[in-house]
């Protein structure tokens, strides 16, 4: 969380957060004094975000809009666009990835930055979790079903509030290194975690790219 807040403060301007969800990052960012335009495809999650922002006293610093990663309803041009929580993994193929990356580029001022995080699973993680229900926290179980051909992760969660399922599509870091320049970005950094350690081939990667 602090990683994205630090990036927002360094940008010195309004920030667009794609897939803002319930505001887990947007609200701390607003508390730090930054104005956030938050976009999400779920009106329900935006309603929760708005209520949390009111409770935190930062509703005036959040501008929440319903929209898609590939077509965000934003006319403003900003110094920073973020897409946290591996949200680009909801995109199913390179066509959708390029469309979303180019859309993010259009929101940026010249030299502005796109910051996002994704993952690529290790074979060990796949073997340890595939097809098994695992208790992630008391009363909440999670099951991962991996398809290496697709390649996809179908993640099922069950708990006291009910059950849900979502599918994520991942690609290797090398593919992001190719897609970003194709979409009009220069890759500035690829970290291995939010503490800014160098990427060394692990599962997680955190990207900073600049609009050309």
Spans of features found by a protein language model:
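C-terminal lobe and adjacent flexible extensions of AdoMet/dcAdoMet transferase-like proteins
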Residues: 175-212
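Conserved SAM/SAH-binding loop-helix junction
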Residues: 24
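Class I SAM-dependent methyltransferase SAM/SAH-binding core
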Residues: 27-71
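Conserved class I S-adenosyl-L-methionine
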Residues: 12-21
């Amino acid at each position: 969380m602090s990683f994205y807040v630090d990036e927002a403060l360094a940008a010195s301007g309004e920030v667009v957060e794609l897939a803002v969800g319930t505001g887990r990052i947007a609200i701390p960012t607003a508390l730090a004094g930054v104005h956030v335009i938050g976009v999400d495809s779920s009106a329900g999650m935006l309603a929760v975000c708005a209520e949390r922002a009111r409770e935190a006293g930062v509703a005036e610093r959040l501008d929440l809009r319903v929209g898609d990663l590939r077509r965000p309803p934003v006319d403003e041009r900003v110094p920073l666009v973020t897409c946290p929580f591996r949200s680009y993994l909801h995109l199913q193929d390179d066509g959708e990835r390029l469309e979303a990356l180019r859309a993010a580029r259009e929101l940026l001022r010249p030299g502005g930055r796109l910051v996002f995080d994704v993952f690529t699973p290790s074979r060990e993680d796949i073997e340890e979790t595939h097809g098994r229900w695992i208790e992630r926290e008391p009363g909440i179980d999670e099951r991962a079903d991996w398809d290496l051909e697709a390649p996809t992760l179908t993640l099922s969660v069950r708990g006291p509030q009910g059950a849900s399922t979502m599918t994520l599509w991942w690609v290797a870091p090398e593919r992001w290194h190719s897609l970003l320049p194709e979409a009009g970005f220069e890759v500035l950094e690829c970290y291995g975690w939010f503490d800014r350690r160098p990427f060394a081939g692990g599962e997680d990667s955190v990207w900073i790219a600049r609009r050309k």
